[in-house]
């Protein structure tokens, strides 16, 4: 929330706006809106969300009282909260086209170069062409496989760093090391090499994502031009976008020069694919540099954050459940007995069924984006007997759905075995399990995200035993998420790595 001065200005400026809205609404037929908690003038339902620093937790409790379709007012923004598989199916499958737009606030519009991306872009011909391009050219199975050498090199470097710490008897913040590893991997996949400015770019990216997810007055009262002009959130978003554009602009220029000189290595990265397509004639849309930068914003934001978050939660939950850790380690060590390094070819030949269950369960218990990316209702419609007005913001609380005791036995417990003999997958067809969403707006990068995790997770379990610092018990490990769009672990995961099978060159 921004400072009190802006809130005071908001109260004065918006009384007239709300009065006008009230008069307009009185002339329209009364709608049968979904139920919701009582509201206050100006702020709407926001006071109901302060019981937890994590809105999706507070929303789950409210949904227990008001139902799986619940209407909130976040400032002047009507917001539908979806909290059951049946309601999620209605939104993301039955009425998918009606809810195919994204809810755009002013900060997101800035960060995505006026919505020129896939994640937040307006549903239409340009969006369809960009998604098709991403699925076929950037995130295809063949493209993901082409990055195998990069993943293997980065995992090997990660293991060597851990082995050095283990040899010194030191503790490590594994969550930070995982984040660094995933970022390095994704930077190389995206632009072809490590970038000297990658830390500045990622700092600007994370600042932008944080600002976009905040309940700032600019986002709560989008109709007020005064608040938009006074908003510090907008200024932060502009600064973050300009920093990202500066760095990406330099990378684009350097990549174009390398491609012109015939550097084959420059043709292997995602950005080089985009620049090659930009140069070729025949695309149904013009692939401008702004669109390229917006797509890179999507790829970095979705690819790096969600993968590192899920890998951290896998290790966190196995530390909390030692029997699960032992079972996963036994499977990996039996499969790769005698090896000094694990490769992706080794992984493809091995049947690491339990390891895959661990990843599935981590994605259930700790959905990467707990409320998914907000959708918007394109036209007034009926869902489960209720009227949903045009332009309503829609939040699908997959965190609550994936912990619903009606569908999951011992829903708050980490039990990979629950997925044995189960047909549930990441494809968004089973609406009680939607870690990557569903429908037209489902995340297209799930294959790359899982690929960036699996080899690292197997290597962490194969090469090292893991112990908590002295005096800590598994039950003491913090499992609260940090506030924000992505459900990151709030506290660092500090552990003692103990070398079991030393990685090569350690």
Curated annotation (Swiss-Prot):
Name of the coding gene: CYP71Z16
One Gene Ontology biological process: defense response
Family per record: Belongs to the cytochrome P450 family.
Record function comment: Involved in the production of antifungal dolabralexin phytoalexins in response to biotic and abiotic stresses.
Keywords carried by this UniProt record: Heme, Iron, Membrane, Metal-binding, Monooxygenase, Oxidoreductase, Plant defense, Transmembrane, Transmembrane helix
Residue numbers binding heme: 443
PROSITE patterns named in the record: CYTOCHROME_P450 (PS00086)
Reaction it catalyzes: dolabradiene + reduced [NADPH--hemoprotein reductase] + O2 = 15,16-epoxydolabrene + oxidized [NADPH--hemoprotein reductase] + H2O + H(+); 15,16-epoxydolabrene + reduced [NADPH--hemoprotein reductase] + O2 = 3beta-hydroxy-15,16-epoxydolabrene + oxidized [NADPH--hemoprotein reductase] + H2O + H(+)
A Gene Ontology molecular function term of the record: terpene synthase activity
Membrane-topology annotation of the record: Single-pass membrane protein
Organism: Zea mays (Maize)
Coiled coil start-end: none
GO CC, alphabetical: membrane
InterPro entries (UniProt xref): Cyt_P450, Cyt_P450_CS, Cyt_P450_E_grp-I, Cyt_P450_sf
TM helices/strands, residue ranges: 5-25
Record keyword Heme present: yes
Domain of life: Eukaryota
Protein name: Dolabradiene monooxygenase
Protein's cellular compartments: Membrane
The EC number(s) this enzyme carries: 1.14.14.159
Cofactor field: heme
